[in-house]
């Protein structure tokens, strides 16, 4: 839940760009978050720093969806059998590079909180970026 009371006046927060409606998700379509939209409407003083770690890491839009498996990220199929690995290409290096760039942006902008995309192999609290930001002392809230 995105509680407006959880943020200080004028606070800078890191936000997954896809939650703001930017078409940077794997399929290239916008997917804005109504919960985030509501928060920003109630708290216009918040300063948003939008990031897409996967794009920052060098992955294109659109791209094959990624799936976390044992600490790594692999490309998967887009069809109904998306859980089966098609190419199996390991794209972990792109995710790690994007996570490092995201952490740098968060630190440079003095962001203490981040609102990230739930279920993303990158942005989920258990994703590569989510874990890296948590280790850096940044509070993560996942939303969809």
What are these model-derived regions, one by one?
Residues 31-84:
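Short, surface-exposed acidic-centric catalytic microdomains
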Residues 121-126:
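Phosphate/ribose-phosphate-bearing ligand recognition and processing surfaces
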Residues 12-18, 50:
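Short, hydrophobic/glycine-enriched beta-strand segments
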Residues 18, 117-120:
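Short, well-ordered beta-to-alpha junction loops that form the rim of enzyme active sites
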Residues 21-27:
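Short N-terminal binding/cap micro-motifs at the start of the first secondary-structure element
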Residues 12-13, 112-115:
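Structural motif
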Residues 1-8, 34-47, 59, 98-112:
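Short amphipathic alpha-helices and their capping/turn segments at secondary-structure boundaries
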Residues 2-3, 7-9, 26, 56, ...:
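Divalent-metal-activated hydrolytic enzyme cores
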């Amino acid at each position: 839940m995105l509680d407006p009371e959880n943020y200080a006046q004028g606070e800078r927060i890191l936000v997954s760009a896809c939650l703001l409606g930017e078409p940077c998700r794997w399929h290239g379509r916008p997917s804005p978050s109504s919960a985030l939209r509501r928060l920003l409407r109630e708290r216009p003083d918040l300063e948003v720093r939008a990031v897409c770690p996967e794009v920052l890491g060098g992955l294109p839009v659109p791209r094959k969806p990624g799936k976390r498996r044992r600490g790594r990220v692999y490309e998967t199929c887009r069809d109904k059998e998306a859980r089966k690995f098609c190419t199996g290409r390991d794209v972990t290096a792109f995710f790690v590079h994007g996570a490092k760039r995201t952490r740098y942006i968060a630190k440079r902008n003095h962001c203490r909180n981040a609102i990230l995309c739930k279920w993303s192999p990158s942005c989920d609290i258990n994703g590569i970026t989510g874990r890296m930001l948590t280790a850096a002392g940044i509070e993560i809230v996942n939303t969809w």
